[in-house]
Amino acid sequence: MTDYKKPDHWQQKARKEGYPARSVYKLKEIDEKFSLIKPQGKQSNFRALDIGAAPGSWSLYALRKMAGNGFLAAADLSPLSREFDNYDKNRRLFDGCNFFFIQGDITAAPVRETILSKGPYNLIISDVAPSTTGSHMIDSARSLELAETVIEYAQAALAPSGNLVVKIFQGGGTDLLLKRMKTLFKTAKSFKPEACRGESVETYFVGIGFKL
C-alpha cells in the first residue's frame, strides 16, 4: 500500500466524527479562516450551494454548522454517501435544515435550471475535481474548466455580497482565473488548507463579497 492510500490522521478523524471523507477538514479550515457559514437566528434565510458534493462531507459540515437553520442545495454526478440515508426526501429536511440534492451533470441545462431556481445563494462551495489521468497538464486543464463552470454558477446564482470557495489544481491559467475572481469579488485569495496532502497540487480560491 502506498503512503497516499494509507489511512492518515485526517481520514481516521473523519471516520470517528461521522464524515465520509477527509476533505471535510479542508472546508473547516477555510470556514474558520474566512467565517463563511454563519446563518443568524432560528428563521435564518441563509442559503448555500455545494457543487460536486459527493460523497457529502462538505454538505454534512455545512448542515451541522447551520444547526437546523437556512437552506442547502447540493449537486453531483454521483450519489451521496450512506450518512445521508436518513434524509427525508419528502420533507426535504436533514438535521432540521432544509436540504435539496440533485444527482446529475452540473453543465446540463435541466440541472443548472433546477439549481438556479433554488437561489440566490449567500455561499457557494465546491470541492469538485476531474477524474485524474496522471498527466499534470491534462488534469490541471480539466480542473480549470470545472472551476470556470463553478464561477459561472456564482455569477448567475450568488446574492450580493455572497462568497465562493472553489478547488483548483495549480497549473497554467490558474493565475488568470484568480485575477478574474478579483474583478467579481471585493476580495479573492488562494488558500491551501493544512489538511491537503503535502504532495497535492490542489488549492482553493476564496472569493469574499460578490459584486453585482
Regions found by a protein language model. Give the residues of each.
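Class I S-adenosyl-L-methionine
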Residues: 170-212
